[in-house]
Amino acid sequence: MNRKDLGKISVIVSTYNRCDALQVCLLSLFKQTVLPDEVIIGDDGSTEETASLIARLQEQAPFPIIHVWHEDKGFRLAMMRNKCVARSTGNYIIEIDGDVFLHPKLIADHLRE
């Protein structure tokens, strides 16, 4: 698959009050051999600590990071992922959980035929 044929690549990262894991996850996205065009963090009602971490990492990121948050009313992961897909501008979407450390070629491997 050719990157140009795909258009924009969006990575959606779901999270809930796991700043330690989210930071590791996002830093591993920074080191991808093929960078996404945007990363959308779907936050299922985390505290302000998560928003602060995301704000700090937005300043360092080699791509836009968009923080999508909704109030904590129980586990609503599917609803949050749907909001993130609606917010994305990518033609190709990769969904991951916020506690995943990514291999540097994860996106490149997705693009292989």
Q: At which residue positions do the language-model features occur?
A:
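Short, acidic, metal-binding catalytic loop of nucleotide-sugar glycosyltransferases
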Residues: L27-P36
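Acidic donor-binding/catalytic loop of UDP-sugar-dependent glycosyltransferases
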Residues: E49, V100-R112
